[in-house]
Amino acid sequence: MYKRQLLKDLQRSRGVGLILISHDLGVVAGAADRVVVMYAGRVVESGPLRPVYDHPAHPYTVGLMRSVPETDGAEPLIPIPGSPPNPGRLPDGCAFHPRCALATDRCRVEVPVLRPVQDGRASACHYAEEVQRDGVPAGS
């Protein structure tokens, strides 16, 4: 906790930005105002911290959030199924489609573009609005 506060204090007192690269969204939540989520070298979601955390608009962001341990340990971690793709041999379409429970034929052939969604955010998912509204089934 002390390190997070130190980083925030330095940002404010010096008027500087901070780029924090991490898979641990719990750490990011304590240090960031904006979040950029990347998968296979592409931005899949970006926006202000709270809206991204409260209603993620990409299935990979949902998966990352499910993998953040709760402080009380009451909820089990839910891993994202499958493995990340080989960066030199990405699948056609959305790179996340082999691991996504919401993937359709469209996802397998068409690369989704990063587009605006609610609350000043952007998502590279064909079904961003549905993900925000309905979530993603556990284990996906």
Located regions from the model:
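Polar low-complexity intrinsically disordered regions
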Residues: 1-5, 137-140
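Short catalytic/signature loops enriched in Gly
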Residues: 46-140
